[in-house]
Amino acid sequence: MATIEVKDREGAAKGSVELPDEIFAQKVNIPLIHQVVVAQQAAGRQGTHSTKTRGEVRGGGKKPYRQKGTGRARQGSVRAPQFTGGGTVHGPKPRDYAQRTPKKMKAAALRGALSNRAQHGRIHVVSEFVPEDVTTKRTQTALKTLRKITDSDKVLVVLSREDQHNRLALRNLPEVHILDANQVNTYDVLYADDIVFTEAGYQEFLAHAKGSKIAASQEDDQ
């Protein structure tokens, strides 16, 4: 079982935590991860797009000219698809893009994504970003702490659900995406260059992982 250092606000080691093998040392299944990420992105689509067919466009009930004798092609409505202002043929209609993904697949994909980040040294744990007694320039203080940990432009910060102090300090930083410990997902882990847990957030994540069977045994996946 691997361990990583817990850094303080100055970037110095103040302890260590273990990275459980059942979460951070698993096989990276790229096709599975791709399937889960695509499903997650699809679920975020609104699917409210809509176009009108010739039967739904207002007007066009009158035949524009007689059937025969004009030398022109016969037409029955000015709302036919070939006319400007006419209906759309096979256009998009409202639909649900959500794909059903089994929980075990989501869990295995997340384990693979976290394992990849751990193998490349992109998992970090910090005691805190801002002390509780700091009430001014919190964002500046939090950014200074973050830069002692990583220089990445895309950072996923995982906080304890109750940690409002650090959340308020970090939320306006454009390079930071904040998640609660129970919201960690495959897409956000892969999108970020580095993942930084607070110490409390890391312990909460491990508890949630075991409770939701993210740390399921290998036998369950086979």
Curated annotation (Swiss-Prot):
<dbReference type="InterPro" id="IPR013005">
    <property type="entry name" value="Ribosomal_uL4-like"/>
</dbReference>
<comment type="function">
    <text>One of the primary rRNA binding proteins, this protein initially binds near the 5'-end of the 23S rRNA. It is important during the early stages of 50S assembly. It makes multiple contacts with different domains of the 23S rRNA in the assembled 50S subunit and ribosome.</text>
</comment>
<protein>
    <recommendedName>
        <fullName>Large ribosomal subunit protein uL4</fullName>
    </recommendedName>
</protein>
<dbReference type="GO" id="GO:1990904">
    <property type="term" value="C:ribonucleoprotein complex"/>
</dbReference>
<dbReference type="InterPro" id="IPR023574">
    <property type="entry name" value="Ribosomal_uL4_dom_sf"/>
</dbReference>
<keyword id="KW-0699">rRNA-binding</keyword>
<feature type="compositionally biased region" description="Basic residues">
    <location>
        <begin position="60"/>
        <end position="71"/>
    </location>
</feature>
<keyword id="KW-0687">Ribonucleoprotein</keyword>
<dbReference type="GO" id="GO:0003735">
    <property type="term" value="F:structural constituent of ribosome"/>
</dbReference>
<comment type="function">
    <text>Forms part of the polypeptide exit tunnel.</text>
</comment>
<keyword id="KW-0694">RNA-binding</keyword>
<dbReference type="GO" id="GO:0005840">
    <property type="term" value="C:ribosome"/>
</dbReference>
<dbReference type="GO" id="GO:0006412">
    <property type="term" value="P:translation"/>
</dbReference>
<comment type="subunit">
    <text>Part of the 50S ribosomal subunit.</text>
</comment>
<keyword id="KW-0689">Ribosomal protein</keyword>
<dbReference type="GO" id="GO:0019843">
    <property type="term" value="F:rRNA binding"/>
</dbReference>
<feature type="region of interest" description="Disordered">
    <location>
        <begin position="42"/>
        <end position="100"/>
    </location>
</feature>
<dbReference type="Pfam" id="PF00573">
    <property type="entry name" value="Ribosomal_L4"/>
</dbReference>
<comment type="similarity">
    <text>Belongs to the universal ribosomal protein uL4 family.</text>
</comment>
<dbReference type="InterPro" id="IPR002136">
    <property type="entry name" value="Ribosomal_uL4"/>
</dbReference>
